[in-house]
Amino acid sequence: MRVSTRVLAVLLLPVAFLRAPGRARHLACQWALGLRYPAENLDGLDPRARRAFEEARTDAFWQDGQLIGLTSGHRDAAEQHRMFAEQVRRTGSWAAARRWVLPPEESSHVRGIAMDVRPTQGAYWLELHGGRYDLYRTYDNEWWHFEYRPETDGRPPLRMPHPGAEPYHSASRW
């Protein structure tokens, strides 16, 4: 599927060039990935986070032949609450649920800066190269979860064991 998506993007390049000469590779990549991952929705992402994600996956696609799709991006508070309530029901406790899903008031998805990506190879590429775009994996237990974090000045934020873990407070970073 990766090869056919790449071939499709190459075929779309002339049309993309006519539409946006300076951004043809970006546009052709987004079109091809949109066909490859038709259910993905980038709406609601913080505009800077969306731009960073699109730039990262365009570079991954053209430079390394790697596909990066979005499984979940922005969620409204009601959807996040539904997911959290379901996880509480499934795990039996609020604390156990927080290991996988946060309530809306704490969720980076609700703020529009979190992206759950696929496939695993795409997540691996993003883990290796995402810092160039201020995109970082933030939880040990979620290989797919990345956040747009420009405030870290190019340094990876401290990765937490899981979403509900208490942040480690220290005067210095390791």
Give the role of each language-model region.
Residues R2-W174:
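Cell-envelope/glycan interface and biosynthesis
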